[in-house]
Amino acid sequence: MSDTTTAFTVPAVAKAVAAAIPDRELIIQGDRRYTYRQVIERSNRLAAYLHSQGLGCHTEREALAGHEVGQDLLGLYAYNGNEFVEALLGAFAARVAPFNVNFRYVKSELHYLLADSEATALIYHAAFAPRVAEILPELPRLRVLIQIADESGNELLDGAVDYEDALASVSAQPPPVRHCPDDLYVLYTGGTTGMPKGVLWRQHDIFMTSFGGRNLMTGEPSSSIDEIVQRAASGPGTKLMILPPLIHGAAQWSVMTAITTGQTVVFPTVVDHLDAEDVVRTIEREKVMVVTVVGDAMARPLVAAIEKGIADVSSLAVVANGGALLTPFVKQRLIEVLPNAVVVDGVGSSETGAQMHHMSTPGAVATGTFNAGPDTFVAAEDLSAILPPGHEGMGWLAQRGYVPLGYKGDAAKTAKTFPVIDGVRYAVPGDRARHHADGHIELLGRDSVCINSGGEKIFVEEVETAIASHPAVADVVVAGRPSERWGQEVVAVVALSDGAAVDAGELIAHASNSLARYKLPKAIVFRPVIERSPSGKADYRWAREQAVNG
């Protein structure tokens, strides 16, 4: 198991990196540009404000069980921008635990999340003020409201403070608290297959697995803050453009890794939806080298915008995908329009952090098989053992080493998802996998959306890949519906490209070129658009409803 002699906190690392490269730009969004020095100063002010409101750590970790929390929680209900990044850093500096709030949630979902988290503070864009106002009377613990001004024109809620006014009201000195590697980072799961759950991470553990605590080239754990600072200061300050919303874990990990490795984060100017033309023009203007996407839903519009030739994107060297399937068809299109770039697939989850990766280059495009990290394994079906490479059986993707403490407030689910195997604690969130003899791991899919038809397991990702490769298909999600004969049957919910015309029979025939007969959809349901989370992840609850209702 990987280890390091130094226990890290995010505030210590961020402060040290910023001191070494104070004038390097950290955040760029349109005309808004902030250096490392400015972001740290602003985040310190936010930390001071949170501390002035009595927020912080009230019970140290050693007195708590893995599913318990001793810190105040701050919800981040905002679009991408400097405020979100400052809020992450400021919360850590105040010993307040930040967590993500999905800005697509309707009233009942938002209420559930804020009640489950027991949040005492919320930072939100003014555009969301009406939604917050609806549920405030039912959330007596939520007492600190910080509103970010935007173009919505919505006025401050009663009892709320303007974000910039909050920063201006306090000193730029960080609060007098002693940071601890046990301080929490909280990440709520997407809730696309069940109710959202708050995953509790120690700062040291999430730093080592997903915030840049490992050398990006060798994978070796960092041994000291001095080593991290030297690496960040000697680097070129690569510009990284983040397309997924920061309410998505992988997007937060990209930002935090950028900070701890001395990179510059670029956000699109359009934040409430993906504007691919704005994206490619920003890539040209800022000479972006790396862009992050989430699956076909983001990559397809990006390819289309590049194909229009409206911007020079020759600076782009890497397209990094994570969080959703990027099919070989779309991956190949990306490589065709970006012949000098590589496409990197990353695998991870809220419960594991970053785990595996795969790189596709011209002439070598593949999906589904990954280079495993040093702490990534495949556990047996019954969780009794770890399967050796070359074992023919299908098991569970498992992660050891730097793993979360548990799920907030749920000891039973914590014990189930984080079992002890051969004396070692693992995170096993529910992905099916095989460990090949050459060391690569084949990711089969999430068990919770697997379809059991006639006794056969059918992974929806494989069917989605087959349907998505038809040129008329803009987007697809696959789900099961009850079948008297098979128990469950496969249904594909499809959105067609503008102007495209194709019938169900043609799509099924196309899929038969790469799928066994029993995996083929028994029906195709056409919809104008596929419902996804803001980050691009498929909403499988919605997909099942469409499959059942036709």
From Swiss-Prot:
Signal peptide residue numbers: 1-19
Pathway assignment: Lipid metabolism; fatty acid metabolism
Regulation: Inhibited by 2-hydroxydodecanoic acid, a typical inhibitor of medium-chain acyl-CoA synthetases.
UniProt-listed PANTHER family: LONG-CHAIN-FATTY-ACID--COA LIGASE (PTHR43767), NONRIBOSOMAL PEPTIDE SYNTHASE PES1 (EUROFUNG)-RELATED (PTHR43767:SF1)
Purpose: Catalyzes the activation of medium-chain fatty acids as acyl-coenzyme A (acyl-CoA). Shows maximal activity with saturated fatty acids of medium-chain length between C6 and C12. Has lower activity with tridecanoic acid (C13), tetradecanoic acid (C14) and with unsaturated fatty acids like oleic acid (C18:1), linolenic acid (C18:3) and arachidonic acid (C20:4). Shows weak activity with some aromatic carbon acids. Involved in the metabolism of fatty acid during mycobacterial survival in macrophages.
NCBIfam families attached to this UniProt entry: PRK07798.1
Family: Belongs to the ATP-dependent AMP-binding enzyme family.
Protein name: Medium-chain acyl-CoA ligase Mig
